[in-house]
Design a protein with these regions (language model features):
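Conserved beta-strand-loop-alpha-helix junction that forms the acyl-donor binding cleft
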Residues: 78, 107-116, 134-139
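Conserved GNAT acetyl-CoA-binding A-motif
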Residues: 97-109
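Conserved acetyl-CoA-binding loop-helix of GNAT-fold acetyltransferases
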Residues: 82-95, 118, 122
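Residue-level recognition of specific faces of alpha-helices
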Residues: 70-73, 108, 119
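Acetyl-CoA-dependent GNAT
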Residues: 3, 7-73, 77, 90-92, ...
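A short, acidic/glycine-rich surface segment
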Residues: 58, 115-119
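Conserved SAM-binding loop
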Residues: 5, 109, 122
Length: 149
């Protein structure tokens, strides 16, 4: 069977959330369904899934703010790792971003995720010195820090 890369459809939600859980991408304070709802309101064409035989086997969210592009939630089903699914998803996200005029794409990887770091290295992504910071404005679930005010 071949892998199809296409835009996320609402019927994909349960499968995508399960995929993110399997891949260890979810956190208790970050409701994945809320992330999906928010993404569908902003550049939904940059939310992609990989499908084989009617089943979702991969996903990636991308975004472009006019300055930089970002990749989020890249995940591949364990049964499909090492088969080019993640590479195909990144390539399509990059193609769409470039078509929008995006000059550079960035992403964040947890420091202990050596597998992801090696994957992105192989795709030509280079680490750079920066201090990544964040400020939570909305808490989606229990266990997270309260919103900063």
């Amino acid at each position: 069977m071949s892998i199809e890369i296409r835009a996320f459809a609402p019927a994909d939600e349960d499968a995508v959330v399960a995929l993110w859980h399997e891949a260890g991408l979810t956190r208790p304070w970050n409701d994945p369904r809320a992330d999906i709802r928010r993404k569908l309101s902003v550049q939904p064409e940059l939310f992609l899934v990989a499908v084989e035989g009617g089943s979702v086997v991969g996903s990636v969210m991308a975004g472009y703010d006019g300055h930089r592009g970002w990749l989020y939630y890249l995940a591949t089903a364990g049964t499909h790792r090492g088969r080019g699914v993640g590479t195909a998803l990144v390539a399509e996200a990059e193609r769409l971003l470039e078509a929008m005029g995006c000059p550079k794409v960035q992403l964040m990887v947890r420091p202990d995720n050596a597998g992801a770091r090696g994957f992105y290295d192989a795709l030509g992504y280079e680490p750079f010195e920066t201090w990544a910071t964040g400020k939570r404005l909305i808490v989606d679930g229990p266990g997270g820090p309260p919103p900063a005010r």
